[in-house]
UniProtKB/Swiss-Prot annotation:
Stated name of the protein: Atrial natriuretic peptide receptor 3
Lipid bilayer topology: Single-pass type I membrane protein
Note: Has low affinity for peptide hormones in the absence of bound chloride.
The UniProt record lists the keyword Calcium: no
Taxonomic lineage of the native organism: Eukaryota, Metazoa, Chordata, Craniata, Vertebrata
Propeptide boundaries: 27-40
Record family assignment: Belongs to the ANF receptor family.
Amino acid sequence: MRSLLLFTFSACVLLARALLAGGASSGGGDTGPGNRRREREALAAQKIEVLVLLPRDDSYLFSLARVRPAIEYALRSVEGNGTGRKLLPPGTRFQVAYEDSDCGNRALFSLVDRVAAARGAKPDLILGPVCEYAAAPVARLASHWDLPMLSAGALAAGFQHKDTEYSHLTRVAPAYAKMGEMMLALFRHHHWSRAALLYSDDKLERNCYFTLEGVHEVFQEEGLHTSAYNFDETKDLDLDDIVRYIQGSERVVIMCASGDTIRRIMLAVHRHGMTSGDYAFFNIELFNSSSYGDGSWKRGDKHDFEAKQAYSSLQTVTLLRTAKPEFEKFSMEVKSSVEKQGLNEEDYVNMFVEGFHDAILLYVLALHEVLRAGYSKKDGGKIIQQTWNRTFEGIAGQVSIDANGDRYGDFSVVAMTDTEAGTQEVIGDYFGKEGRFKMRSNVKYPWGSLKLRIDETRIVEHTNSSPCKSCGLEESAVTGIVVGALLGAGLLMAFYFFRKKYRITIERRNHQEESNIGKHRELREDSIRSHFSVA
């Protein structure tokens, strides 16, 4: 009996172990069928479908012709012997489709049309768009469809709200708000609290509007005062009105416009005596292109001398450039590819070109981690979360993405350090991840010290101190004005004497006529009386 009980107990223990083992293998453990399927997917070769939405119009700094070579360079790196081969399953390939975004609704239509044509099959990754009005609807749909979207654009302040409609967007280029943080650090360094925002606004793509919107929002949050003035530089500029606005607003002016427009404004304020240290002018040039102001005063025209003097009061804000050996190779390959398409320019590698290259690297890093965790390439939300709050090595140096999916921005301030030669150098740098602004100690500052002292409360007496006596007018124009004034005075005097003589003549004639009329009246009256009396 005792042996029977022992046998029964042993059998129950074995059965329980078997049941537990079976439950572990079939119930939600790490080795269940669902997880084994995910592991197989993670180890299997991946076909990553990428949709690139950028404009074909080469007037844009981020056109397909400019950015495509950078994307293909990155893909060769990750598919070849680079980091991608170590991170992704063997045999993984990227299939890329390039569509014209036209910087408008065509971007959204292209995405919807491709999904419809593929019977609902969606891309695994969206790169772009850049233009704000093109990116907004695509980002909303990407969030709805659970698609990761990486862009070196969509830089406006509105895209930083990632809690709802932009939840699947990562910005791999510094947003305008990051530049606003840099300006805030610069103002704190100089102990300034007020700024005038002066910008061009074409009411279409509104690049400068969105640029200075980032400054305005950051300043407003920190209690700094701003006033704003906008103009359309595609039309005739009222430079006098712009000067009056500056004189009546703030002493520190932040501007965004084309290089030629900035030069015209600086010449105007210089001719009104506003470049002698009472004002500080800043020009935003994030994209290293003349479209947004190239910071150069020289044009080879008769105004170069004045412009050089005026630019001694202008500082230019641009991206901090770092370079490593691989970047030089990358730049040469991009330049070669772009030139083959008939584009010849000085700056082949700009912020957008770098950004989309780094977007591929960031996506590969995130996808690797998601696959290792047992998820698939279709888990867009998981992938996009892995792109946030991390630092990785980009083509030009370290790239840091904050916890909100926006890249930290490193910026430099360029100023004229030699007023005789007109030489401009970097005088200070801002490091976005650290939130630190630092002036360089090995350069000569145009104002002579580390801090530019601007008294924001002192009233300035504005005088026209143009070095040219005619205030910018040609000598012949001045001569014409003087001769015209003399002729006008002569005509007025001639008219006065003619009018006086004519008046005397008229008065004499009227007097004679009145005398004759009186005589005729007397004769007629005498005749009537004579005849009446006779009757």
